[in-house]
Amino acid sequence: MPTSKLQANMSYREVIPRNLSPAEWIEVKINTGTQSTLQDLKTFETSGGYCYKNTKNVQTRNRFIYWRTYQDVLELSEVSLDISLQRNHLRLRFTDSAVLNVSLTEQGTSVTLLVVTVSSVHRYVFPLKVAGQEGGAASPEDLLSQSIFYDVNDKINDPSTYYVTDGFGTMPNAAVSYLTQDSQSAYFAVAYQSKLLLHVMKCSTGHTITHEIKEPKLMPWFLSNLKGALTGRSETLEAATSMAFSEIGGEIFILVLYRNNELRLWSVDNLQTVASINCSTELGQDSAAQGPQNSQLRKISDQNFCLFLSHNSRAEFICVSIMPDADDASVINLVQNMVPAPQTDLVDFDATSSHIWALWSNAEGDFHVSAAYFASNNAIKWVSAALEPPPDRYCLTMEQGVDPRETYCSYIFHPGRFDRNVIAKALYMFRRVNLQFDVKQLSMSVLKEQVCQAVEDEIQNELKDFVVTDEEYLEISTRLWDRFYSCCEQYHIKLSEPTGLAVLGGMDAVCLVRRQSFALLRPCEVLEHLLLIGEHNDEVATYVAPLFRNDPEMAKGFVELMNVVTLLDKLISEDIKIELDKQLYQRESPVEVISKLVARISMIDDNGPILPSNCVRQIQQKLQNIPNLEPALEMLLDVLCMIDPDEPPHDYSLSTRFLQSSGALMGSEYGLSILSETVKQMAMIRFSVCRNLLVLQYMAYGQNEMESENVLTNLNYLNSYYTLVWIAETPISSSTPAGFEASIQRLSRAQLFSGYNRPYSSHLKHNGNDQTTLLRLFLESKGLFSALTMLLKHDSLSLDSEQLNLRQSLLQLVGYINKMLWPGSPIYVFPEWLFGTCHHIIVQDYVRILSNWCSVQKHARRFMLAVSLLDCGEAHKAVHLFHEAESGIVEDDFLFEHVLKNTPLYGKLQNSVSRGDTISPEDTKLAIVHYYLKVIQLFEQHSALDYIIQLADMAIRVLQPDDPQLPMFQSIVFNNHLQLGHYVEAYTALVNNADISRRKDCLRQLVITLFQNKCLPLLMQFSYIGLQDEFESIVESRARSMSIDQNEVYNFLYAFHTNKGNMRKASTVMYEQAMRFQVDSDAPNALEKRCSSLLICLNCLHLVDSRYRWIAKPVLGDEQVITIDQDNDDGEPKCDEDKRGQEVVVLELADIRRELVHAEALRELSFYRKDTAAYERATPEELSYLLASSGLYTAALKLSRGHSFSVLPIFESLTSACVAATEDKSSDAWNWLQNNDMADLPHRSNAADMAWTLLQKLVVDNEAKDSTLIRKSVVQRLLGLNAFLPQWLINSYKLSHSRELLHLLVKHNRLLEAADLGCEIIAGMLGAGSEYFEFKHAVNIANPQLCFPISTIDLLLHGLKINGKDDLDYEMAYFKLEEEVQRYIETIKRTTDDKMSMAVLQMRTDLQEER
């Protein structure tokens, strides 16, 4: 059977472009200066269309213009299914002049518009923008996207473009226009009630000539052979109703159809009738007048025309041809096969050489389209086209507890359900106020807010005086929302009424023009024809037999089975279908759902059974009457199958090009909309077939046979087509979701989304359409070009040169798109794109719908779902899904491409697969490692640390203990435990790490982290088995690298070594800390901390074995310079060995103790002087003097105890301070007294007394035994200050060295005091008070001789004698001392004599004894 016959007898289906941008009209007003005629003429809304003929040109392929007129307005819209045109809507308003006729003609690079109004004729030329032929800076893409109306401006009112025909009295009732083939002249024929005028306009100048076409009184000779009579006509019957021009052999004719159904052919050249025939007479009609409908004439070609003739009892279509007879005269012949017209009202029709297309309406106002194929005797008479029904309010089901606003908004604002203008007009009606706004500037989201606010205002108006319950509120809300929906529905029905149709010949489609939009009638496929139309199915079986192995019986069985499926579809109510869809969406078992449905079909409830018993029996009987049911069922399943399971997989995901305005096939806004609507229509039809077929299978086989292969296949198809319907209907935002950029960046950084470009198209302007469907967005961004790639690859077509009609392009593209969307398809273009949209709710819903029945690409879907859940913050769910997807890393193409793409393993595995080799377990294991690494990178960007540990543990379980990748995952476990604060687990992980270097690195991180978080007790308790030296090194390095001012590491090290019992290391740490405080710190408490460190160091060393009580100290810079100076006068060490030897100094206890005393002295000084830092390098002696000068005498003396310098300056300073305190009665002395240690001193209320008491205590405490240096220094200082000596000092001195005190007094000219002391000394020597002096005995014959200070006494006497001349006190003192000296001399003499006598006696006694 030829394919043409199959195409000719298949029906068509309406496709409405939905969710389009609002039309932006170019408004042009044309004023010809004529009188208003609108009130005198009743005009009907007419429409038509024109399809570009040069369909091989990419620019004009799938491109057409449709128009509609109403009174004085002509609206033209240029549409391209391939190119998104700009400024493609033109509205011409012929001021007060109704439009009668519109025609469009194409001439190479321009389109001519001819318009006839009741008072004028117009000709406009619109150039077609061709790339390369236009000047200026416009790019080729911009030129291609410019509509022919793009440059419309005020020149359209140029007088040369129109001619005024007003002034002929009566109003015209018909008109026709024509542009000659050479484009030189434009002809306009205007018919009035009584005459016919012809206007001829020269295109070059616009000059117009008017002729009247008249019937002559006598008939010429060459008309004698015409059939029919030309007499007996009235004026009314002779009025023309329809006309058409024809150009044959360079001669132009006008074919005129009159009200009496007479057809005349007029010659334009001589304005004479060439031929005439009465169609009613030829067809055997009794009445010459036309019937209740207007007879119409349509031009097919210059030789062929189609007529619609209305009679009293019926109507019909006939075709006429202008054919020359043997005598070269023109005759009109009737075509033999006439087509009876249906008994309904004709709205409009169009005809081609093979089809008649008619738009009908009935008394109820319903419209339908039908077509007749009259080029073959085997044609089906009339085949109806399936028009899209209006939105069904019964699909709006209110669920319990759901807000009516949510339900109605989701339904009303579903993408494509209602046009934006419809909702806006409904809003005006609902508000009942004259408040309008620019719809073009109003997005759907804003319009939705306006609608919700309007309904809410109405609700509040009804409730403002009442208090209602929740149930009453919901009832009122539902009623008002239903009222608003009714407004939407009314406007939608009104604005969707068809006004005409036009055959788009080059596209194999029909344009159905509506009041506010248009639709295309596309060819149906077999299942659509059988389910929707159901006409002439027996003949269809004959025509489809070639598709079924040329077996007529099988084709007949297939059609009979589809008849039963169609019957069941009509019997099942829409409520049940909607309920079934909901149950499938909720992933209930289809078999259980169908079993419940079949049980309900036969069960009688309160409302009776769903289907009458006779219907059930009828269905069962029809099934039994199909002789070859099983083959027919298998054939139906083959037709439903969308993919070839034996076809090798192809990678179409590499089609990365996006839609450009320069145009891909079906790439414009209109093309994409028609394509997506067609996919949706076919998916819904096939889903209905699968659903009804499953019911029939259950009814035929019963519950026990539902596991057969055919049933399982149908179940798979049912779920698959439901998925396609879900994709086609699911709303999705046209713009990128929140967080899209962040999600894409995360995927890109993890190298999981680098195989293709961004998933959103940028060239299509949505103009406020916030939402579209998932399918539409997919086609816009990637789906169409992937489908075109498949079309070119499989069909070897050239889209740039070959002419493709809708049957070849649209249906094939739909087939390839279905293959991409098919859940069981190996092509992963759609899942990949959906994954990249980052619409997580939709991704999760998609995976859920396929979860429990589709095994193809299940690992990829788990991976997609896991990524989606991770982005949504549900990492705990994502972990398990990532683990489940692990096994598909080398099996699933999607995972293989996206996970392994940028790894070294990718090329190796790809070569193995291409050679057909089996992938080794080692490579599989390595692939899993790469998989987990990328997944871990993804989790790291989400900071999901807990789950990274789980993933790493999963990877570790896959690896062998000696695997080189194992330490990496162990390090990952450690790092994430560390970041989470699981320090014990982190330590365990680092100890178990198989790589020593990683173990040390991890230990360093652990130490640093624990120090930063102040977890020192935890750091102390770890055992560090095998890592202690490394640990100490790390801690020491950290201690030295940190500022000493905020450094707790030294204290930790001291505690650590102390805890381990290593006191020598503990002392070293403390000494190093003290050095750091000395060298690096400028903190106020640095000296305090240094002293504390040195003190701790001393304590630790005391606990060490005496053999190891030393510390090795590095020589500091200044110390090294001092050492060099000591080595050599020239400043150089003696040799390199000496220099190296001096780099380290060994310190013993005494050295450290001296350093401690020095530090404590500096600390004391720092309390009272701000310039202490300047004296840090001062010697101990210098420092002691500084302390003394600051009144810190006890501190200065403490410093001196560890050193050998003299303390005499300290006591001299203190002595001076005591004298000053005595002489100055102010309280300043208390300031320096409080800075000294007076804990053991009795309290005195007088500062001077406290000062002398302090001096006494310090002298006593610090004077060495048998030494008078300190007292001498104090006495000298007192004498030098001419101060009195305190009695305690004199008494102490007398007991130690009275003669020295006497000498000091004499030396400082304190003669009277010296005289008194001299008298006391002499008296003591003589035995009177000797216990107050250092004498151990008095002058006595039995005692040794005493040393008498004869020089001092002599000098004292001399001084007294000299001063006694002028002062009586000195004279008396002189005499008294002289007297005492004389007494002492006498006593000495006597004693000496006695000693001599005794010596003589003793000697004698000894001699006698010897004898």
UniProtKB/Swiss-Prot annotation:
GO terms for biological process: double-strand break repair via homologous recombination; mRNA export from nucleus; protein import into nucleus; regulation of nucleocytoplasmic transport. Transmembrane segments: none annotated. Changing A137S: In strain: s131. Signal peptide: none annotated. It is found in: Nucleus, Nuclear pore complex. Changing S204A: In strain: s81, s95, s125, s131 and s196. Disruption phenotype: RNAi-mediated knockdown in nephrocytes alters their cell morphology and function. Reduces total number of nephrocytes starting from larval stage and results in shortened lifespan. Its main location: nucleus. Keywords: DNA damage, mRNA transport, Nuclear pore complex, Nucleus, Protein transport, Translocation, Transport. It holds the Pfam family NUP160_helical. One of its GO terms (cellular component) is nuclear pore outer ring. GO terms for molecular function: structural constituent of nuclear pore. The keyword S-adenosyl-L-methionine does not apply. Part of the nuclear pore complex. Interacts with Nup98. Functions as a component of the nuclear pore complex (NPC). Involved in poly(A)+ RNA transport. Required for nuclear import of Mad. May play a role in double strand break DNA repair. Essential for nephrocyte development. This is Nuclear pore complex protein Nup160 homolog.
